[in-house]
């Protein structure tokens, strides 16, 4: 069972995804999920960090340069 609201939301979304496949085999689910969550995650954390990249990187537990690269990849800089 889900331990928190985020996990529950992901589980519910994946259940819907699998039901909507209508018998087709899924592919690249891991990449699909990561791509779907990364941009809103970055946007939300940057908002909570008042666009301070060092603080946002700390919140995410990643290096500031890694955060900057991800922000650029998503066109958020």
From Swiss-Prot:
Feature: DNA-binding region: 53-72
UniProtKB keywords: DNA-binding
Gene Ontology terms describing biological process: regulation of DNA-templated transcription
Highest taxon of source: Bacteria
Presence of keyword DNA-binding: yes
Pfam families (alphabetical): HTH_8 (PF02954)
Example GO molecular function: sequence-specific DNA binding
KW Ribosomal protein (keyword) present: no
PANTHER family (UniProt xref): DNA-BINDING PROTEIN FIS
Entry similarity comment: Belongs to the transcriptional regulatory Fis family.
Protein name stated in the entry: Putative Fis-like DNA-binding protein
Native source organism of the sequence: Ralstonia nicotianae (strain ATCC BAA-1114 / GMI1000)
């Amino acid at each position: 069972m889900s331990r928190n609201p985020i996990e529950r939301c992901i589980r519910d979304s994946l259940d819907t995804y699998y039901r909507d496949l209508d018998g087709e085999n899924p592919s690249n689910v891991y990449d699909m999920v990561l791509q779907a969550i990364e941009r809103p995650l970055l946007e939300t954390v940057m908002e909570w960090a008042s666009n301070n990249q060092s603080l946002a990187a700390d919140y995410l537990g990643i290096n500031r340069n890694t955060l900057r690269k991800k922000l650029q990849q998503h066109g958020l800089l």
